[in-house]
Swiss-Prot record:
Keyword Coiled coil: no
Membrane topology type: Peripheral membrane protein
Localisation per UniProt entry: Cell membrane
This enzyme's EC code(s): 7.-.-.-
Domain ABC transporter stretches: 2-234
Record GO biological process: cobalt ion transport
Record family assignment: Belongs to the ABC transporter superfamily.
Name recorded for this polypeptide: Putative ABC transporter ATP-binding protein PH0132
Species per Swiss-Prot/TrEMBL record: Pyrococcus horikoshii (strain ATCC 700860 / DSM 12428 / JCM 9974 / NBRC 100139 / OT-3)
Source species, domain of life: Archaea
Pfam families the record matches: ABC_tran
Length: 260
């Protein structure tokens, strides 16, 4: 379980970025949303110890992040950064994904097994000999996820994973997230894309000006006045409300509900 207990953070005195944040999350897909500058990335950097609370505590499965190293936390919390290119340095996809498990001290057979599993999970089987830097934007994003998956962390943080993706890349990402969820991964997703939230999130955490404004189910989130928080309500949600339908995640669900 991830627990934030009255967490405060500031980069310099007089400019508080997070204010008394408290919540707990154990499984599923949690989307963290909010306007620019609301503290989203600051919050998730506390999950693997890149940042430590100035006041309060962050606990990961009972471990206080103030008391352990980033390396120790990385075995529990995997972090995929916004720019996947910054993660790559090997000459091919196989070596890239194998790097993490090798550093965990696993034997060669287990490393190969994890690489195969991770590439299968993100739809990149057959890419083993490809140069990471020659992949498309969506393929690079999926490779970055595979690199972290191969280390088998309990929690996976995706920070703005759909940045720069075209429609096909976004759909591939959605499929990866759904696949990982089916396999039991717990995912923390930071995004500005409210339609992505609608499609994949089980719970939503809303930040504004460093304050926790909402934490609850995706259904409850879309009952809020999103525009009042500087967020755009998806057209699908508007249409659903107009025709008196409670909650659907995509067009296919909407058509099924109305009998088309």
């Amino acid at each position: 379980m991830i627990e934030f207990r009255d967490v405060w953070f500031w980069y310099q005195e007089g400019k508080t970025v997070l204010k008394s944040i408290s919540f707990s999350f154990s499984e599923g897909t949690l989307a963290i949303v909010g306007p620019n500058g609301s503290g989203k990335t600051t919050l998730v950097k506390m999950l693997n110890g890149l940042l430590k609370p100035k006041k309060g505590n962050v606990l990961i499965d009972g471990i206080n992040t103030k008391e352990v190293s980033v390396a120790e936390l990385s075995r529990i919390v995997g972090y995929v950064f916004q720019n996947p290119d910054a993660m790559f340095f090997e000459e091919n996809v196989f070596k890239e994904v194998a790097f993490g498990p090798k550093n965990l001290g696993l034997n060669e057979e287990e490393v190969k097994k994890r690489v195969r599993w991770a590439l299968e999970a993100v739809g990149l089987r057959g890419f083993e000999n490809r140069n990471p830097f020659e992949l498309s934007g969506g393929e690079k994003q999926r490779l970055a996820i595979a690199c972290i998956l191969a280390m088998k962390p309990k929690y996976l943080v995706l920070d703005e994973p759909n940045t720069g993706l075209d429609e096909r890349g976004l759909q591939d990402l959605i499929n990866v997230i759904k696949n990982l969820r089916r396999e039991g991964s717990s995912i923390i997703l930071v995004t500005h894309d409210i339609e992505l939230v609608l499609e994949v999130a089980d719970k939503v955490l809303l930040l504004k000006d460093g304050e926790l404004k909402f934490f609850g189910s995706t259904k409850e989130f879309f009952e809020l006045d999103l525009e009042g928080f500087g967020l755009k309500e998806p057209e699908l949600v508007k249409i659903s409300k107009d025709v008196g339908i409670n909650f659907v995640r995509n067009v296919e669900e909407l058509l099924k509900v109305i009998g088309l």
